[in-house]
Amino acid sequence: MFEHETVLKWESIKGLNIKPDGIYVDCTLGGAGHSEEIVKQLTTGHLYAFDQDDVALAHAAERLAAYEGRFTLIKSNFVHLKEELEARSVTKVDGILFDLGVSSPQLDEGERGFSYNFDARLDMRMDQTSPLSAYEVVNEWPYNDLVRILFTYGEEKFSKQIARKIEKAREIAPIETTFELVELIKDAIPAPARRKGGHPAKRTFQAIRIAVNDELNVFDRAVYQAIDLLAVGGRLCVITFHSLEDRMCKQAFKEKSSLPELPQGLPMIPKEFEPELRLVTRKPITAGDDELDDNRRSRSAKLRIVEKMKES
C-alpha cells in the first residue's frame, strides 16, 4: 500500500492560489496528497502530475479515480517537464508544485534500499529502469568521487573516513546491502560523533541517493523550466528538505525576482527591467507545531513561493 503523509499540504495548496479553470502541474506526484487537493478545486481546469515510480502512479490513478477527466498522469522525471507538457500542447500553466522529499513508502519499504533502518540490497533508484544504483556507486566509484559526494551532497564531515572504510571493505568483497553499509559508516565515525546528530548513516544515505538520481542537477534544470512555463499571475511552490536544494531554489528565485543595476534617481523603472518573478514568501514557510507533532519528516521542510509578473 502506498501510504504517504503529505508535508505542508495546506500551505502549498493555498500558495498555488488555485483557479477552477486553471492548468496545474504536480512535478512530484508521490502519494497524490497534493494532487488530490488540487483536482478537488478544479472544474474545467486540468492537472498534470509527474512521477517515475510505477507503484506511485498506480496508487494515484486509484486515489484520483473520482476526478476522471481532470488529471493526466505522466511517467517521467520532472527534468522533462517542458518537453512532456509541450507534447500535450501545453505551453503555459497557472501553477506548479515541487515536493522534493522522498516519498514515505520509498523510505519505508525495505526492498527499495533507501532506508538505513531496513536491510535490503543497495538500490535507491527512484526510476527502477535507471542503470545506476547505489550498489554501483558504493562498489565502483573511486575514493575521490565518494569523498566528493559525501561532503557535497551529504555535508558529511567524516566523508574521507567513510570513503576509506568503503574502499577497504570492497577490496575484500562487494558491499551488497544497506546494513553492511551502515556498519561500515558506524565504524568510520568516531564514537562521540555517533552519539549526536541523529542516525550516523543519515548523511551518507542522503548523499548516495542524490548521486544515484542526479537530484540536484535535475532540480536545477527543472526549476528554470517551471519559471518559463508559468503564465503571468501563475504561482510556483517548492518544498525542499535539505539545505542544498533550498539554497538552489532560493538562488533561482532571487535571480528572477531581482532588479538589475540601474542608474540612481530614475523616476520609474523601465518595463523591460522589471523582474520576472515576485517573492510571495520572503522567508520560507515551515511546518507548524501540530504538523511537527504528527509527522517528524516535516521538521526539515521549507516552502518557498513565487508569482510570475511578466514574460521573460
Swiss-Prot record:
GO molecular function list: rRNA (cytosine-N4-)-methyltransferase activity
Cellular-component GO terms for this entry: cytoplasm
Record key words, sorted: Cytoplasm, Methyltransferase, rRNA processing, S-adenosyl-L-methionine, Transferase
Subcellular locations according to the entry: Cytoplasm
EC number: 2.1.1.199
Domain of life, per lineage: Bacteria
Enzyme class, broadest EC rank: transferase
Pfam families documented for this protein: Methyltransf_5
Binding site for S-adenosyl-L-methionine: A32, G33, H34, D51, F78, D99, Q106
Catalytic activity: cytidine(1402) in 16S rRNA + S-adenosyl-L-methionine = N(4)-methylcytidine(1402) in 16S rRNA + S-adenosyl-L-homocysteine + H(+)
Residues in coiled coil: none
Gene Ontology terms: biological process: rRNA base methylation
Family named by the database record: Belongs to the methyltransferase superfamily. RsmH family.
HAMAP family associated with the record: 16SrRNA_methyltr_H
Function: Specifically methylates the N4 position of cytidine in position 1402 (C1402) of 16S rRNA.
NCBIfam families: 16S rRNA (cytosine(1402)-N(4))-methyltransferase RsmH
Stated name of the protein: Ribosomal RNA small subunit methyltransferase H
Organism lineage: Bacteria, Bacillati, Bacillota, Bacilli, Bacillales
